[in-house]
Amino acid sequence: MTLSRRKFVRDLGISGAAANFAMGLPSLGWAASGISKKRLIFLFSPNGVIPKHFWPDQAGELQSLKRILAPLEPLRQHVLTLQGIDNRIKGDGDGHMRGIGCLLTGIELFPGDVQGGSDTPAGWSMGISVDQHLKNRLQENPETQTRFGSLEFGVMVPDRADTWTRWSYAGPNQPMAPISDPYQMFDKLYGQTQNKAMLASVLDDLSDDFRKIESMVSPEDRVMLKQHLEMVRSIEKEIKSELQLSSGEKTTRHPVPQLEPNVEEQNDNMPLLCKMQMDLLLSSLVNDFTRIATFQITNSVGNAKMKWLDIDEGHHSISHEPDSNEEAYEQLIRINTW
């Protein structure tokens, strides 16, 4: 089948969002030549891990995973742990500020006027972060350019700009703000919508577009299309459920344990917010909107209360308990595993 991209979109009357996904289906002839796209996601969660229950006991092929990494067991053959790569950054700022502010930059913080819990005050990072460096490299090459060079996702990141809330840097003194609101991220990915009701409408149109494409692709691509359609429907369902809840209507959605039935940015909604952001992240990768992303859960010194794990005390507070406190030790393992 020989068909130009422009004619394909015009004749089918599908949206740009659906077309962008369709262009990557091999049976339509526009996919890259057999070479898998390389993608990279950096994930941040605060307050460290319990080493004994995270790192393997010996080097080499992983025969088993420790308790914290156990959820990755179905993917164990693809898991690689890199121990001993230490980012020993000195300079201004306390350990928490340097812990996040230098994590992806590998360089010190500028002197500044932000005072941490100890040590000298500090400012932003002195250099670019590795995610933005890779973004720039990919965007320079027409074959690896994407609509968004990178995407910065957040979950419950405080609405303030300081050294504790930023880890991605476009350059010296240029922190990148993560987007914590999944609806705002949807707007970024799929266009500037006026309200949440329009989001559901856009997703509904996408579903129709994918059905138009279905008969034109191979059985293998049809499987990919079906998976993508299911993901779109899942996000659409969550948005419609939130709209129903805000208007007082009943919903049949199974609630996330111990969460209020809404999708507001609040502590108890963290599991649902994580899922919605991860769905959008997956969507952006499948659509090849980006190949580089950061996913930031709260912030340095993050003190979320993991009530869905039956933990009422703040995460950061628990992390300062000694290992001899068996209850706190166990709580940290559960938090790390989650």
Where do the language-model regions lie?
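Ligand-binding pockets and gating/stacking loops
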Residues: 1-338
